[in-house]
């Protein structure tokens, strides 16, 4: 007979590391500092760019907005695998987030994500007149997180079940 986990027993090391990594990711990707988004084009070439308008408030989903005409939108539609990188100001804590991204132009989701984003001041594309909708939502469902402390050559990971159940996504 399988016994249920003892709530008084301390979590195992992997669980503690996963909790630590998730907490750091939430702090570093909180929308107050930019992150780097990497996508892959149709030729298999990587492309990276700074993204400064984002939210991790609907864990484990990371939201950002972009121009619907941007190359990253086309990259994600062809290959949804993306990677994000965040760091603290001293660059001694690095968080890498990997997952699958989706593009949404749904009006309801756009309104909900707009409300989640605290700082839109660096969404420069919003000041450029376009035909159609002014932005698209990039929703990344987080599948894996690495936390690296380069000064000490230490690496922690969280993935799969460690991240919690996938969120339903806004407006779904």
Report the location of each language-model feature.
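A short, Trp-centered hydrophobic/proline-enriched beta-strand micro-motif
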Residues: 27-42, 82-86
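Residue-level signal for well-ordered, solvent-exposed loop/turn and beta-edge residues enriched
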Residues: 43-47, 100
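Charged, gly/pro-rich active-site loop segments
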Residues: 1-19, 96-172
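Short glycine-rich loop/turn motifs
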Residues: 34-36, 48-51
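A generic structural motif
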Residues: 53-54, 108
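Short, surface-exposed beta-edge/turn micro-motifs
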Residues: 32-34, 60-62, 79-82, 133-137, ...
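A short mixed-secondary-structure module that forms the rim of ligand-binding clefts
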Residues: 54-91
